Amino acid sequence: SRRQRQMCIRDRLAAAAISSERGHDVILLEEAPALGGNMRLASFPPGKGPIADMVRSWVVRAQKAGVEVRLGVKALPDDIAALQPDEVVVATGARALLLPIEGIDCPAILRGGDVLAGKAYPGKNVLIAGGGMVGCEIADLLAELGHSVTVAEYRENLAADMVAEHRSALMRSFAEHGVCQVPNAKICRFYADGVEYENTLTGQLHELRGFDSVVLAMGYVADDRLSEALAQCGISVHVVGDAVKARRAIDALREAYELAVLL
């Protein structure tokens, strides 16, 4: 059968490698200077080294399969159409969730992903706004590096979305490093040095102020904007990974594998 010319956008290593192994010509576009996307960032917190090993193994596999990798390339609809691909796999991932909260766009507030990537450097005393898995892993990393860390979370339990075994280890690390936990905290307003929040149990307003840095880690939302533009150009598009829904890495990898087998 005819070799299909496929294009994987924004670092979907698994789909690219498997598709190429199955005989397709694959171009992998990545806007960043390195492959790995959010998986690479996820490997930075304590105990997540095996994720980096997995990313490296997929990079090697893609290279051996003959995937053409183009780094530092912003995927624009017109440029993609000019390459005349038979299929396009869009894996643009997820972007930080920015809720309509007063002050959330304050320039002084750091993004969690930027902290993990080494693009932003928090001060000594840090407030993490958001205590899900990502926020807690950032808190754990900063605490191990010697920062004084406080985590404010809307839910009653921090890291409620983590696997139980991993959460237990995280809580032990929090206790060891003196990480302060503020649960049931619905953030109402951001300041450069902290937040105002409502206790969801009592309805009372409180402030957490006086921090050197505030790090935003309130979750992610699927980034599917590119696929919509490509579809309007009449290009066959498949959306995978966090571009469909922000979720666990294992789920995104399984989806990428299943798609690569079908194409």
Regions found by a protein language model. Give the residues of each.
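Residues that mark the start of a beta-strand
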Residues: 3, 25, 124-125, 148, ...
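Short, small-residue-biased leader/transition segments that mark boundaries at the very start
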Residues: 2-9
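Glycine-rich Rossmann-fold phosphate-binding loop(s) that bind the pyrophosphate
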Residues: 10-11, 130-132, 219
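Short glycine/serine/threonine-rich phosphate/pyrophosphate-binding segments
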Residues: 12-15, 109, 135-138
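A Rossmann-like FAD-binding core segment of flavoenzymes
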Residues: 52-98, 104-124, 144-229
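Glycine-rich FAD pyrophosphate-binding loop
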Residues: 22-38, 147-159
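Gly/Ala-rich phosphate-binding loop of Rossmann-like dinucleotide-binding domains
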Residues: 16-21, 139-144, 231
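A conserved FAD-binding loop/helix module that cradles the flavin
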Residues: 136-138, 157-166, 238-263
